[in-house]
Amino acid sequence: MIHYGNCNKICEKTVMNQRTIKTAIAVTGTGLHSGQPVDLEFHPQPIDTGIVFERSDITGSTPIPASAFLVQDTMMSSNLVFGGTRVGTVEHLLSAIAGLGVDNLLIRVSASEIPIMDGSAAPFVGLLLQAGFCEQDASKKFIRIVRTVRVKVDDKWAELRPYNGFELNFEIDFDHPAIDKNFQHAQLQFSTQNFIERLSSARTFGFLRDIEAMRQNNLALGGSMDNAIVIDESNILNEEGLRFNDEFVRHKILDALGDLYLIGYPILGRFNAYKSGHALNNLLVREILSDHNNFEIVTFDDNVTCPIEYLPLNGITVEG
């Protein structure tokens, strides 16, 4: 018998137990590269099963665990491949899952890529909130960083340091008139509330010249100003402009949060990065997991002793 645990409304109390969603829920979006409709379903999962992807368009497809070791392609997104089956562009969805503290979830998708939605994590957050949450009868596990680990490629680098909480610091370096030099660094002290209010709605961005080149190769066919910030040689082309002055770097933090969740647990540590991307984020996670002296798995008896705030979600609304 599969044991999901006893359900409690998340708005009633904060818990340090594992959680899954209360009810299955589905949505249809557009594939960024294919431009075709993609069906996405979320289903509850038993304790200690983690985040698992499954291709609903392939009969008998092999489930794909959300693991950094299954990332085989980081060209513009994080893409998982297992048993010959691929699920791509997982980082925005994983960021939403991490931001809401979901430990166990089955994600069924009808194509080789997660739908792009509006280019942020906010639509996924709204969908998960609509599904509701179920507290499960098992302690929530965290991975605590106990030794600083840094990876570097050319002038780009990323690191995780010991820290009693979870903090993300990111700096980008774009010499472009539309990307203000004063807004190329951002910091997020992680909590559910900070994630929803300050990070979840930050959209992905791209340069018009790159999008045109990709379309010539039958890529980015679903990309538009409805799901990305588009920049030409001097301006932001979206009529509504930016959602935040520093939306570009906030989105890089959003990406990193999703990439880092492929470590398998919520992180206790300080993430610092300079010009990092999916490849370097993945390399960092693999490097940490390669040596058990870098980390320890811990649990907390209650929310008072846990240094991360998974706040009650009542009263918080998300557009998108």
UniProtKB/Swiss-Prot annotation:
A single Gene Ontology CC term: membrane
Keywords in alphabetical order: Hydrolase, Lipid A biosynthesis, Lipid biosynthesis, Lipid metabolism, Metal-binding, Zinc
Keyword Transmembrane helix found: no
Matching HAMAP family: LpxC
Family annotation (InterPro entries): Ribosomal_Su5_D2-typ_SF, UDP-acyl_GlcNac_deAcase, UDP-acyl_GlcNac_deAcase_C, UDP-acyl_N-AcGlcN_deAcase_N
Family classification: Belongs to the LpxC family.
Gene Ontology terms describing biological process: lipid A biosynthetic process
Pathway the protein acts in: Glycolipid biosynthesis; lipid IV(A) biosynthesis; lipid IV(A) from (3R)-3-hydroxytetradecanoyl-[acyl-carrier-protein] and UDP-N-acetyl-alpha-D-glucosamine: step 2/6
Signal peptide: none
Superkingdom of the source species: Bacteria
Protein name (Swiss-Prot/TrEMBL): UDP-3-O-acyl-N-acetylglucosamine deacetylase
Record keyword RNA-binding present: no
Binding residue positions for Zn(2+): H92, H251, D255
Reaction(s) catalysed (UniProt annotation): a UDP-3-O-[(3R)-3-hydroxyacyl]-N-acetyl-alpha-D-glucosamine + H2O = a UDP-3-O-[(3R)-3-hydroxyacyl]-alpha-D-glucosamine + acetate
Molecular function, one GO term: UDP-3-O-acyl-N-acetylglucosamine deacetylase activity
Known function: Catalyzes the hydrolysis of UDP-3-O-myristoyl-N-acetylglucosamine to form UDP-3-O-myristoylglucosamine and acetate, the committed step in lipid A biosynthesis.
Named cofactor requirement(s): Zn(2+)
Active site: H278 (proton donor)
EC number(s) from the headed UniProt entry: 3.5.1.108
